[in-house]
Amino acid sequence: MLVQAMTFEGDAAGLGVAHAIGQSTATDRRVLVDDYTRHVINDRFLALTRDAQIKTEAEATWAMFDALVAAGAQLRITNPVGANPFAYARRNHKKLLVMDDVVWLGGINFSDHNFAWHDMMLRIEDREIADWLAGEFDRDWQGRPQAAAVSFADIELLSLNGSDNETGFAPLIAAFAGAKASIEVISAYPTFPFVSAMAEAAARGVPVTLYTPRPNNKPVIRDYLLGMARASGLSIRLLPEMTHVKAALIDGEALVVGSSNFDFVSHRANAEYVATISDAALIVDCEERLFAPARAASRETEPDDHSVWRGFWAKLGLRAADVLIAGLGQPKRIAEWRRP
């Protein structure tokens, strides 16, 4: 049993997952949690909050991890921030479960607020794929992740280490820019260079639609997207509830899912998993479960949603953040669990 997440909190959702891991009879029980969880609880920076409830949940999280180790599971922390607060920007963003010959990959973290959001994981039953992803998990476990790609019958898997992402993402960005019939994307946080590539397709007359939540926990992204739409011809449709799904459908023939938000942080710094699927039956299933409901529930933007100034400042701020992250070195990759 191999478990990897960026967020793993000591609330009802996280404790339920931890209990299942602790009770498992698997001989190999390993858990990777990003150092994000030692700094952010319930979307609140621990160093910046005086909220007693958040502090209590943090203590419950540390106790949960201690109990996991006491139950015989192994636990390590990815990308520890250490003494450099700027290292926080480089995260291991992967979400993965490997259980014998079955794997799940996608966007789901283990916390109540994440469980409350619309989200998805792709379940794959295949020994070869499970073995390959277990190998990638082990690279992260050893603190030696590498950029890697592999093709199976109808799925291409990409494992990104946060250092060589520009090369790894190049085929996906080219696929967005070169789309011929349509692009549909569900994501709360898409930005350049992915959105810029989609805009290239839109400039050629290809219909490009992005479904993104109106109640976004990062509203600057919504402002950026609305500003881009005015300048590029992208269609932005707002969903009534928060979604954490990361999915793209290109020309109705290629389904892209995984942990990547299709954003500059993913492109620049995050360790990620991305799957590109050509299986027609699975694409039809995702069309019915994801894209058709998004089309039905979403609404066109309204005049009050748009602000030239908000769009300008959002784009400027995100570009500045990209420059900052580009100048950061790669932090230490792995550490044994210990309380903050």
Residue spans for each PLM region:
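Structural motif
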Residues: 2-6, 104, 184-189, 214, 256
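HKD-type phospholipase D/PLD-like phosphodiesterase module
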Residues: 7-178, 211-254, 260-267, 271-275
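An exposure/low-complexity boundary signal
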Residues: 150-192, 301-340
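Redox- and metal-dependent alpha/beta enzyme cores, enriched for Fe-S-associated oxidoreductases
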Residues: 196-197
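Helical hairpin unit composed of two closely spaced alpha helices linked by a short loop
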Residues: 200-201, 206
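Long, C-terminal catalytic modules of enzymes
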Residues: 253-255, 260-340
